């Protein structure tokens, strides 16, 4: 039994594994780009299949493709979407910057499979042509950016945004639950005036709410599709109604608000929509890193750290120190946030480096974009499930640190003035006294006045957690 078959393209014949659906151009890419291990993301492959499915339907409706061929292409695309042919898409991210080889990989797989569905023999009877039929009314230059936007929008809507909302809700519930717990604040890593634990956490909630708004603001641009621009944005070799119809078809089959890009030249020449959207993801990463750092500092200890909150003990933390438990969810979250920030640099460089009518950094851009979405979505889910939901206050420790703080002296500013209040704090710190003892020793106020004016619960202001 032959292990290879001969396939040909405009450059001639080449041997292809007999059991594979791909053709000559895919095989050439496999042989010429043996670079690292990163493959085209499955979600991008499925977005390409969605794009080809929609194009086949519209080409049929416009009388440009026979019902027989269009139906076979759609059936083959549905098989790809069902995951039946995932191993037919082996190409590396590091290939042509337009994604042409992955577009042809999809064209060849769908053409060969559609030909089989119509009774043809793989690689011998080409009843459906990869370029003339599967790629009809298309160019890699508009297909690949379209698939990028489809994959990106679906990932943001289905993966990232739900997890962001869940984590925000968890922290909002914690903020309300801890609204009455007065604790010492900290600025510059030094003691500051009091606030409630609920107020502190409400800041985290507001950060995430703003992140959600920033991400949602970026979605309409990502929903604009390049399909119909063909080679350079002019729409050469397309029907006048094709671009609008194919965007409408993709919107229907994905239940997402896709529209045809109003300017195809921008859609082909730039990655601006994904640059902007990933900027919002970088902002989310910055917020999550701050939150995770706050959590692990507040939970530090258990006896020699801040220790104002407890977090779940999920696994042993040391191979040498018995009983040690570490804030591992915080560490995982901060690491992936660093990766997202690195991805942002790569995406910015790729987005800035397009020339004339086409950006040729697209595979790298979408690889990093989808990785960031996956990291943030998975990271938030894990952090929420294994850490955030289990945050609990250590009231005794909170009260101890609150009562030991010298910054409670700030409450005296309006009664005896800043200079005298500062003198009290310095004396207490230098001589190891309580604030009250230092104040009475200096004779600036009576014990009754001190007790009446220095009350932490009255120093947290009227700003409620959440607004």
Curated annotation (Swiss-Prot):
Which reaction(s) does the protein catalyse, per the Swiss-Prot or TrEMBL entry? Answer: (S)-malate = fumarate + H2O
Q: Say which enzyme class the record assigns.
A: lyase
Q: Give the annotated active site.
A: 188, 318
Q: What is its EC number?
A: 4.2.1.2
Give the molecular function GO annotations: fumarate hydratase activity
Superkingdom of source: Bacteria
Q: Which GO terms describe its cellular component?
A: cytoplasm
Q: Which UniProt keywords apply?
A: Cytoplasm, Lyase, Tricarboxylic acid cycle
Compartment(s) of residence: Cytoplasm
What residues bind substrate, as annotated? 98-100, 126, 129-132, 139-141, 187, 319, 324-326
Q: How does it assemble?
A: Homotetramer.
Similarity section: Belongs to the class-II fumarase/aspartase family. Fumarase subfamily.
PANTHER family hit by this protein: ASPARTATEAMMONIA/ARGININOSUCCINATE/ADENYLOSUCCINATE LYASE (PTHR11444), FUMARATE HYDRATASE, MITOCHONDRIAL (PTHR11444:SF1)
The function of this protein is:
Involved in the TCA cycle. Catalyzes the stereospecific interconversion of fumarate to L-malate.
State what protein this is by name. Answer: Fumarate hydratase class II
- Encoding gene per record: fumC
């Amino acid at each position: 039994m032959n292990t290879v078959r001969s396939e040909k393209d405009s450059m001639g014949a080449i041997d292809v594994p007999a059991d594979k659906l791909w053709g000559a151009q895919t095989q050439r890419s496999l042989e010429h780009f043996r670079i690292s291990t990163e493959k085209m993301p499955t979600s991008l492959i499925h977005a390409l299949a969605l794009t080809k499915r929609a194009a086949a339907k519209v080409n049929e409706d416009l009388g440009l493709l026979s019902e027989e061929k269009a139906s076979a292409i759609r059936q083959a695309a549905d098989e790809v979407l069902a995951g039946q042919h995932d191993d037919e898409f082996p190409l590396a991210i590091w290939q042509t910057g337009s994604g042409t080889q992955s577009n042809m990989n999809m064209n060849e797989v769908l053409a060969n499979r559609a030909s089989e569905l119509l009774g043809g023999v793989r690689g011998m009877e080409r009843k459906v042509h990869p370029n003339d039929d599967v790629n009809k009314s298309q160019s890699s230059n508009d297909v690949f950016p379209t698939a990028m936007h489809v994959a990106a929008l679906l990932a943001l809507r289905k993966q990232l945004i739900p997890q962001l909302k869940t984590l925000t809700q968890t922290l909002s519930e914690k903020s309300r639950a801890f609204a009455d717990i007065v604790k010492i604040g900290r600025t510059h890593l030094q003691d500051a005036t009091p606030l409630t634990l609920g107020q502190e956490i409400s800041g985290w909630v507001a950060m995430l709410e703003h992140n959600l708004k920033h991400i949602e603001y970026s979605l309409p641009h990502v929903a604009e599709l390049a399909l119909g621009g063909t080679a350079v944005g002019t729409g050469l070799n397309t029907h006048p109604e094709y671009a609008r119809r194919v965007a409408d078809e993709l919107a229907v089959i994905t239940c997402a608000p896709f529209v045809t890009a109003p300017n195809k030249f921008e859609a082909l020449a730039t990655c601006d929509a994904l640059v902007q959207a990933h900027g919002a993801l970088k902002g989310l990463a910055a917020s999550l890193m701050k939150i995770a750092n706050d959590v692990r500092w507040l939970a530090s200890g258990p006896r020699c750290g801040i220790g104002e909150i407890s977090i779940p003990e999920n696994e042993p933390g040391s191979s040498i120190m018995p009983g040690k438990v570490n804030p591992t969810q915080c560490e995982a979250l901060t690491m992936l946030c660093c990766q997202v920030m690195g991805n942002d640099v790569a995406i910015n460089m790729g987005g800035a480096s397009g020339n004339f009518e086409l950006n040729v950094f697209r595979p790298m851009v979408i690889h990093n974009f989808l990785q960031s979405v996956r990291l943030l979505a998975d990271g938030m889910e894990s952090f929420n499930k294994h850490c955030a939901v289990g945050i609990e206050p250590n009231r005794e420790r909170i009260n101890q640190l609150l009562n030991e703080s010298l910054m409670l002296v700030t409450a005296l500013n309006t009664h005896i003035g800043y200079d005298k209040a500062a003198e009290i704090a310095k004396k207490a710190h230098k001589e190891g006294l309580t604030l009250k003892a230092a104040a009475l020793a200096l004779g600036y106020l009576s014990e009754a006045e001190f007790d009446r004016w220095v009350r932490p619960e009255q120093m947290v202001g009227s700003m409620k957690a959440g607004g």
